[in-house]
Amino acid sequence: MLRYCFIYGILAFVLSGCSLVAQKPADDYQLLAMQHLQQQKNWALDGRLALADDKDSVSLSISWRHDPQLDELDLVGPLGQGRVKISVTSNQVVVDDGDSRKVFDGQANAIISEQLGLDLPIESLKYWVLGVSDPRLAFTEQPGGFYQAGWLVRYREMQDVNSDTLPKKMTAEKDKARIKLIVDQWILS
């Protein structure tokens, strides 16, 4: 019995240490101090994404690679079931679900939302995930986030990445649409 208590004690100690690694409460979020990240040209993130509205919801793993010419999103369903790769350039969206590859011309937000069946404002989200507002649109700062284009964007937890502080947990809500992102890993270059 004493042996099991010792093992559980060690396990609790080790696991609690994992949660102390460079994470900060959302109180550390300050939009103006982060605006320089609008200039971040290349980045990548791996994490978990949840999308929901009043009719549907989905939870996905996400890998997102961004550079000025291309956004590549790899979305995978629970237990690896279902995969969609989305590539976005300034004038084209390519959606590949493994069975078919579809090429669309037009506005990325509308195309992606139609293909996923849920609202995903990709053109602004590529800024929001960095903790900054979309520089092309007006915004109103709020405690822990901001309003932009009808969306309330909030940062629940921050994390140190290189010499910057970036979101660990963020949410965005507009009417009945909800986006929740948890970033497990950032790569800035």
Q: What label would you give each PLM region?
A:
Residues 1-7:
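Bacterial N-terminal signal peptides that target proteins for export
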Residues 35-55:
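A short, Trp-centered hydrophobic/proline-enriched beta-strand micro-motif
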Residues 99-149:
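Flexible, processing/modification-adjacent segments and terminal tails
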Residues 131-189:
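Gly/Pro-enriched, hydrophobic low-complexity segments
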Residues 44-46, 65, 85-87, 92-94, ...:
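Beta-strand-dominated lipid-handling architectures at cellular/organellar boundaries
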Residues 53-57, 78-81, 175-176:
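Solvent-exposed loop/turn segments connecting transmembrane beta-strands
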